[in-house]
Amino acid sequence: MEMLQGLLLWMLLSVGGVWASRGPLRPLCRPINATLAAEKEACPICITFTTSICAGYCPSMVRVMPAALPPIPQPVCTYRELRFASIRLPGCPPGVDPMVSFPVALSCHCGPCRLKTTDCGGPRDHPLACAPQASSSSKDPPSQPLTSTSTPTPGASNRSSHPLPIKTS
């Protein structure tokens, strides 16, 4: 009887684990809409805009005996295809380019995280929104539509796939 109970418990845990990993609580890697912030040091106004980024769950594994074997690379949700769009920052002084370009996700996939070009999580060195200013020049974030786009770039899986502010100097 004890062996039958152990077998039943093992089956329930096995099926429950498979069901939980495929449930609606973990949406798979896909393009989603996100609001980002853009600013330039010389321009007085920070704006927010909506674009599509790659986000979602990528299946991963962890070794049971990590000391015996090297770590398994963990996949991240990243761009498969993208295009670039641009926005114009209002109020920039003469001689300062008011255009800021950013990637727009067309399709996503689970792939390796390339630290050189991708935000792989962890602490951020800049905020995800417009910073409040103490001076009278406001950096309140008015919403801005996209102004121009370029052609899709297939196979560009090494672009940043998480919402980051676009800040240029």
Curated annotation (Swiss-Prot):
Q: Compositional bias (Polar residues) spans?
A: 155-169
**Can you list the disulfide-bonded cysteine pairs?**
29-77, 43-92, 46-130, 54-108, 58-110, 113-120
Q: Which residues are glycosylated?
A: 33, 158
Q: What Gene3D superfamilies does the database record attribute to this sequence?
A: Cystine-knot cytokines (2.10.90.10)
Q: Which coarse location class describes where this protein primarily resides?
A: secreted
Q: Name one GO biological process term.
A: G protein-coupled receptor signaling pathway
Please give the GO cellular component terms listed in this UniProt entry: cytoplasm; extracellular space
Subcellular locations according to the entry? Secreted
| Highest rank taxon of the organism | Eukaryota
Q: Which Pfam families is this protein grouped with?
A: Cys_knot
Provide the residue span(s) of the region labelled Disordered: 131-169
Assigned keywords, A-Z: Disulfide bond, Glycoprotein, Hormone, Secreted, Signal
Which GO-annotated molecular functions does the record name? hormone activity
Summary of subunit composition and partner proteins:
Heterodimer of a common alpha chain and a unique beta chain which confers biological specificity to thyrotropin, lutropin, follitropin and gonadotropin.
Q: Which PANTHER family match?
A: GLYCOPROTEIN HORMONE BETA CHAIN, LUTROPIN SUBUNIT BETA
The protein here is known as Lutropin/choriogonadotropin subunit beta
Species of origin reads Equus quagga burchellii
Q: Gene encoding it?
A: LHB
